[in-house]
């Protein structure tokens, strides 16, 4: 056992088989929910647990650059939905033919249907001008915030809460709606609500948009392209 002169360490080891299975189940059955939300509101205690899980995420230099803007009012969500709809129409025009038709068939109603939305942001000034671990890779604060999103998503799966990540919008429009400062970046708009059914595989795979790549095609040994 490693020495611990400051008394800061605690015993560590593998989880029990049931605990491991629960962790992997959450990972493997997590889905991006687009339209299957139930109207039942989430309790404040549940929301606090999910945000607590997000706040436990690792961050570069312990920067903790995230903030969470909770959005529940219909008026605000409708403004965001209109911003999404404008961007979604623009996105549809970037595809053509059968691909465009399939894109337009994909429903994304979470902004309106989910009882809670969370705008997850990254304050790139937090921690000062020089942040440990970010000196040569300044984008690490954004990656850290994405870790918080993943933590929340997995915790939500364990709680029976669906999460949908909306990324089709002009950031400037959402910032204006929510009064987000210029130096803060939006990382994710998350729609949250209870679900009683989930797709057995990712929805985009189930609907023929794209399939999961074989893992063995993505793993290299000691260098790019080396297998």
UniProtKB/Swiss-Prot annotation:
Oxidoreductase as UniProt keyword: yes
Cited InterPro entries: BluB (IPR012825), Nitroreductase (IPR029479), Nitroreductase-like (IPR000415), Nitroreductase/BluB (IPR050627)
Protein family according to the UniProt entry: Belongs to the BluB family.
Binding site for FMN: 30-34, 59, 108, 167
Activity control note: Inhibited by high concentrations of FMN.
Protein name: 5,6-dimethylbenzimidazole synthase
Catalytic activity as recorded in UniProt: FMNH2 + O2 = dialurate + 5,6-dimethylbenzimidazole + D-erythrose 4-phosphate + H(+)
Coiled-coil stretches: none
Intrachain disulfide bonds: none
The keyword NADP appears for this protein: yes
NCBIfam families attached to this UniProt entry: BluB
Subunit structure: Homooctamer.
Protein origin, superkingdom: Bacteria
Role played: Involved in the biosynthesis of cobalamin (vitamin B12). Catalyzes the oxidative fragmentation and contraction of the isoalloxazine heterocycle and the cleavage of the ribityl tail of FMN(2) to form 5,6-dimethylbenzimidazole (DMB) and D-erythrose 4-phosphate (E4P). NAD(P)H is only required initially to reduce FMN and oxygen drives the oxidative fragmentation.
Disruption phenotype: Cells lacking this gene are unable to grow in minimal media and fails to establish a symbiosis with alfalfa, and these defects can be rescued by the addition of vitamin B12 (cyanocobalamin) or the lower ligand of cobalamin, 5,6-dimethylbenzimidazole (DMB).
EC main group: oxidoreductase
Natural source organism: Rhizobium meliloti (strain 1021) (Ensifer meliloti)
Outcome (variant: residue 32 to A/N/S): Abrogates DMB formation but retains flavin binding
């Amino acid at each position: 056992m490693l020495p611990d002169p400051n008394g800061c360490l605690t015993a560590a080891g593998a989880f029990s088989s049931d605990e491991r299975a629960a962790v992997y189940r959450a990972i493997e059955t997590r889905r991006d929910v687009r339209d299957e939300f139930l109207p039942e509101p989430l309790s404040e205690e549940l929301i606090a647990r999910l945000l607590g899980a997000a706040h436990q995420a690792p961050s570069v230099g312990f920067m903790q650059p995230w903030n969470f803007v909770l959005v529940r009012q219909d008026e605000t969500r409708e403004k965001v939905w209109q911003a999404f709809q404008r961007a979604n129409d623009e996105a549809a025009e970037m595809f053509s033919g059968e691909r465009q038709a399939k894109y337009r068939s994909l429903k994304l109603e979470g902004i309106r249907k989910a009882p809670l939305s969370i705008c997850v942001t990254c304050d790139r000034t937090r921690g000062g001008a020089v942040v440990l671990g970010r000196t040569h890779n300044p984008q690490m604060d954004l990656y850290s915030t994405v870790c918080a999103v993943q933590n929340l998503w997995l915790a939500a799966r364990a709680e029976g809460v669906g999460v949908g990540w909306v990324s089709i919008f002009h950031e400037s429009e959402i910032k204006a709606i929510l009064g987000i400062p210029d130096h803060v970046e939006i990382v994710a708009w998350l729609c949250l609500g209870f679900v009683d059914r989930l797709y057995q595989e990712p929805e985009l795979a189930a609907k023929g948009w794209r399939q999961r790549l074989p893992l063995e095609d993505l793993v290299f040994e000691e260098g790019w392209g080396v297998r």
